Amino acid sequence: MASLKDLRARIGSVKSTRKITSAMKMVAAAKLRRAQGRAEAARPYAAAMRRMLAELGASVRNEAGLPQLLAGTGKDKVHLLIPMTSDRGLAGAFNANINRTTRDLIRRLQAEGKTIRLLPTGRKGYEFLMREFSDLIVDHVHGSGGKEVPFSAAAELGERLTAMLEKGEFDVCTVVYNRFNNVMSQTPTEMQLIPLAVPANDTVASGERASYEFEPGEEQLLSSLLPRNLQVQLYATMLESAAGEQGARMTAMDNATRNAGKAIDRLTLTYNRTRQTNITNELIEIISGAQAV
């Protein structure tokens, strides 16, 4: 049985931990409000731009000389995967879900005979992939570190992907990220960025095309909008991931704070029982000694 001194030390240690987790929960909650607002504001814009460019792509998909961001390289051999994780832990299953989804995707593509390249974003994903797939990593990108995500980060990554595509370093690019649903739920999502997915059905394409009028022509618009769309989609996924990280961290720290409270209650009960037992034993010894005299 632990001594009273040991129990007091353990209670003090758990109380200190509870203060830390409670503070981290409040910080995550404050960051979550901003991150959630930014992610939700970006969704309609990113979705509308994706639909518009899919419409544009559908109208010209049979023409020659299309941009590689739309038509691809004509091959489906080398797949570049961009898993988005956080730089820091203490976020529940946030990073583990992305790592598991990425690993499953890698194995599925390899089973199909594809060549895999990895460009992880965030330290946690990079560290995980280095342990299992170090030979597939071409480079890694630092995450936001819990700070607000600037559009310049997405623009820089988009330009880098465009340059890699032009050099023939990959044929297909897919991002793996956590889509923010609510504080308690984030969904690991795979989204193909390059080449742009366009409708294959002429009826669907023409039906959606009735909502748009393009000026200037489709080809000129594609040349200018495709790079911008890539940056916008990357930015939207970064915002979703940032909101998901703060939501997962807030939930994890709330659970940790609750568990610490329960642990304190259990330790306090044990402490009181031990103290009571010690007092009882001392009284018995005193009474026994008095009777012996």
Swiss-Prot record:
One Pfam short name: ATP-synt
Q: Give the transmembrane ranges.
A: none
Q: Which SUPFAM superfamilies match?
A: ATP synthase (F1-ATPase), gamma subunit
One annotated GO biological process: proton motive force-driven plasma membrane ATP synthesis
4Fe-4S is among the record's keywords: no
- InterPro entries in the cross-refs: ATP_synth_F1_ATPase_gsu, ATP_synth_F1_gsu, ATP_synth_F1_gsu_CS
Q: Where in the cell is it found?
A: Cell inner membrane
Q: Name one GO molecular function term.
A: ATP binding
**Which Gene3D superfamilies did the record assign?**
3.40.1380.10, ATP synthase, gamma subunit, helix hairpin domain
| Bilayer topology | Peripheral membrane protein
List, alphabetically, the GO terms of the cellular component aspect.
Answer: plasma membrane; proton-transporting ATP synthase complex
Q: Which UniProt keywords apply?
A: ATP synthesis, Cell inner membrane, Cell membrane, CF(1), Hydrogen ion transport, Ion transport, Membrane, Transport
Query: Major place of localization?
Result: membrane
NCBIfam families reported for this sequence: ATPsyn_F1gamma (TIGR01146), PRK05621.1-4 (NF004146)
Q: How does it assemble?
A: F-type ATPases have 2 components, CF(1) - the catalytic core - and CF(0) - the membrane proton channel. CF(1) has five subunits: alpha(3), beta(3), gamma(1), delta(1), epsilon(1). CF(0) has three main subunits: a, b and c.
State the similarity comment: Belongs to the ATPase gamma chain family.
Query: Know the name of this protein?
Result: ATP synthase gamma chain
Protein source organism: Gluconacetobacter diazotrophicus (strain ATCC 49037 / DSM 5601 / CCUG 37298 / CIP 103539 / LMG 7603 / PAl5)
Q: Name the encoding gene, please.
A: atpG
